[in-house]
C-alpha cells in the first residue's frame, strides 16, 4: 500500500509541488513487520535528506524483491544490496540493524502515531492536519494540497 502510494502518487506530487518548494513532505516510519522495520532502520542511518528520499523511493520501487524471503537474514541481505548504492556498506548496515536506540525511536514513533492520529491503515496521509486513509489517486491529493496554496 505505501509502495503503491509512493510510486504512483508521491512521485508525481514531488515533481509538481515538492521540487519547486511549494509544499513540505515528511516521511514517518510505520513498519508493520520485521522486514519493514529493518528497512526503516537502515533508512534512518542515511544522513542526507535527499539521499534518504532517493533510497526510500528505491526501497518502495523494489519492495517485492526484498520484503519476502525464507528468513530475516535473507531479507536483510536483499535490503543491503539496495542500500549499498546509497553510501551504506554492509558494516554500517549491520550497525544500523543493531542500533537499539534507533529501533526504539522507530517503534515509539509508530505507537505514538497510532494513538495520537488514530492511524489504522497505511498509507495514511495528512495534509494540513486533515487525514486521508485508504485508496486515493494523484488528482485527489493534488486538489487537496492546492486548496492550501
Regions found by a protein language model. Name each.
Residues 1, 66-67, 96-99:
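Short, contiguous strand/loop micro-motifs
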Residues 3-84:
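Structural alpha/beta surface segment adjacent to cysteine/selenocysteine redox centers
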Residues 7-10, 81-149:
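C-terminal cap of thioredoxin/glutaredoxin-like
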Amino acid at each position: 500500500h505505501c509502495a503503491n502510494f509512493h510510486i504512483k502518487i508521491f512521485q508525481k506530487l514531488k515533481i509538481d509541488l515538492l521540487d519547486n518548494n511549494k509544499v513540505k513532505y515528511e516521511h514517518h516510519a510505520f513498519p508493520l513487520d520485521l522486514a519493514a522495520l529493518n528497512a526503516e532502520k537502515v533508512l534512518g542511518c542515511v544522513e542526507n535528506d535527499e539521499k534518504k528520499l532517493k533510497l526510500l523511493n528505491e526501497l518502495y520501487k523494489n519492495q517485492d524483491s526484498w520484503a519476502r524471503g525464507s528468513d530475516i537474514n535473507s531479507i536483510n541481505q536483499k535490503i543491503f544490496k539496495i542500500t549499498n548504492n546509497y553510501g551504506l556498506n554492509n558494516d554500517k548496515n549491520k550497525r544500523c540493524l543493531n542500533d537499539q536506540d534507533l529501533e526504539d525511536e522507530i517503534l515509539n514513533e509508530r505507537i505514538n502515531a497510532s494513538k495520537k492520529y488514530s492511524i489504522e491503515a497505511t498509507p495514511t496521509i495528512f495534509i494540513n492536519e486533515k487525514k486521508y486513509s485508504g485508496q486515493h489517486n494523484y488528482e485527489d491529493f493534488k486538489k487537496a494540497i492546492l486548496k492550501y496554496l
